[in-house]
């Protein structure tokens, strides 16, 4: 029987609360789907919690455990008590973790966990119904990692955006793999600013080369990022498929997309360090896209669905358990369809109520 080693970072504020519900899901799979194997969970501190205890947002011990693991599950990090002016900040731990694990591809799905949530969207139901795409953001290159010059009092500052062909090729291959795994294969949308930026022109050329030569059966379309941002509001279904873009553009467009499903608490993410083809280890960091929510943490009202769906992504991409991943997603849909909703969705269910409802539906599905 397989044993899956998972490092768990509860993180700060509401992070541990939502992780508890995600772990309930893993325990249910162990019990009700024995062929999935065992989940060996190792708890470590990250972010502010680690600063408070170790004066370090990510210790060497925690980092080494994450490197050796099959996957990493994270709640959320950060909070006002650690400030933004401090030399040691919670976010430094997550950035270091991403860098050391080489997680170059960030995946954020944009869809409705349940059709009943369409009316929760700020967009009209007839506009957003049927939206289903995944943003694949290059995570370890671009302007966030380029040379910068801080303002030294002269009133001048500078950031540079470097990209190499190799960096673009590997994120294009990841997007191509994900698109090809869909049934039927999904369309690939590549977002850039090739009418202005040199890096975008290299991006467009490289993505075209990779998709046309390595994934000839896929349909590829290029879209300027500003046009795509407008399309996302006007007709988000037009981007259905796999959306690939650079670090900066992906950061912005994925946050814009996160508004569509109606609550940031619903949305999962995965940061991968390889192609999840089942042929070798593909470690990843799995976390909800929401922050640590210090204003509502400890009240039992945080929505754990984003974290639970992050577990589904972990099962699919790092642990090669697609049946169980599908079951978790179906259980979330069933729980919401049956009326279990947290406060952010207009309901009264607690964090624990939501987790328990998903587990109850999951048990039915796995035993069927």
From Swiss-Prot:
**Required cofactor(s):** Mg(2+); Mn(2+)
Give residues annotated as binding Mg(2+): 226, 251, 255
Per the record, the pathway is: Amino-acid biosynthesis; L-leucine biosynthesis; L-leucine from 3-methyl-2-oxobutanoate: step 3/4
Which positions does the site annotation Important for catalysis cover? 144, 193
Q: Which PROSITE patterns match?
A: IDH_IMDH (PS00470)
Subcellular location(s): the record lists:
Cytoplasm
Any single Gene Ontology cellular-component annotation? cytosol
Q: Which family does it belong to?
A: Belongs to the isocitrate and isopropylmalate dehydrogenases family.
Which ranges of the sequence are coiled-coil? none
Question: What Pfam families does the entry give?
Answer: Iso_dh
The function of this protein is: Catalyzes the oxidation of 3-carboxy-2-hydroxy-4-methylpentanoate (3-isopropylmalate) to 3-carboxy-4-methyl-2-oxopentanoate. The product decarboxylates to 4-methyl-2 oxopentanoate.
Please tell me where substrate binds in this chain. 98, 108, 137, 226
Q: Which GO terms describe its molecular function?
A: 3-isopropylmalate dehydrogenase activity; magnesium ion binding; NAD binding
Task: Tell me how this protein assembles.
Answer: Homodimer.
The EC number(s) given in the record are 1.1.1.85
Q: Which reaction does it catalyse?
A: (2R,3S)-3-isopropylmalate + NAD(+) = 4-methyl-2-oxopentanoate + CO2 + NADH
Q: Which domain of life is it from?
A: Eukaryota
The UniProt keywords, alphabetically, are: Amino-acid biosynthesis, Branched-chain amino acid biosynthesis, Cytoplasm, Leucine biosynthesis, Magnesium, Manganese, Metal-binding, NAD, Oxidoreductase
The protein here is known as: 3-isopropylmalate dehydrogenase
Under PANTHER family, the record lists: 3-ISOPROPYLMALATE DEHYDROGENASE
- Annotated positions binding NAD(+): 79-91, 291-303
């Amino acid at each position: 029987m397989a044993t899956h080693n998972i490092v768990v970072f509860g993180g700060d504020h509401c992070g541990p609360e939502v992780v508890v519900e995600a772990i309930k899901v893993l325990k249910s799979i162990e019990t009700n789907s024995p062929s999935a194997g065992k989940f060996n969970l190792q708890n470590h501190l990250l972010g502010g919690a680690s600063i408070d205890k170790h004066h370090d947002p990510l210790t060497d011990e925690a980092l080494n455990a994450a490197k050796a693991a099959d996957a990493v599950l994270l709640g959320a990090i950060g909070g006002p008590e650690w400030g933004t002016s401090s030399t040691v900040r919670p976010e430094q731990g997550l950035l270091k973790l991403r860098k050391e694990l080489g997680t170059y591809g960030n995946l954020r799905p944009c869809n409705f966990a349940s059709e009943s949530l369409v009316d929760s969207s700020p967009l009209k139901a007839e506009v957003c119904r049927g939206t289903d795409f995944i943003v694949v953001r290059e995570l370890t290159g671009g302007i966030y990692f380029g040379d910068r010059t801080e303002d030294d009092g002269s009133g001048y500052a500078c950031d540079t955006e470097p990209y190499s062909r190799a960096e673009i090729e590997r994120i294009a291959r990841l997007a191509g793999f994900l698109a090809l795994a869909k049934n039927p294969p999904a369309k690939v949308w590549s977002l850039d600013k090739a009418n202005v930026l040199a890096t975008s022109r290299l991006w467009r050329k490289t993505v075209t080369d990779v998709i046309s030569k390595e994934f000839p059966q896929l349909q590829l379309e290029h879209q300027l990022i500003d046009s795509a941002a407008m399309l996302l509001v006007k007709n988000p279904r037009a981007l259905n498929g796999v959306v690939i873009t650079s670090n900066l553009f992906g950061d912005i467009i994925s946050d814009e997309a996160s508004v569509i499903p109606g609550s940031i608490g619903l949305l999962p993410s995965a940061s991968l360090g390889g192609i999840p083809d089942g042929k070798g280890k593909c470690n990843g960091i799995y976390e909800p896209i929401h922050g640590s929510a210090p204003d509502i943490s400890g009240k039992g009202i945080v929505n754990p669905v984003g974290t639970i769906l992050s577990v589904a992504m972990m099962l699919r991409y790092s642990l090669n358990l697609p049946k169980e991943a599908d079951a978790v997603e179906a259980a979330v849909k069933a729980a919401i369809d049956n009326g279990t909703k947290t406060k952010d969705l207009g309901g009264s269910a607690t964090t624990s109520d939501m987790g328990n409802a998903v587990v109850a539906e999951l048990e039915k599905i796995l035993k069927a």
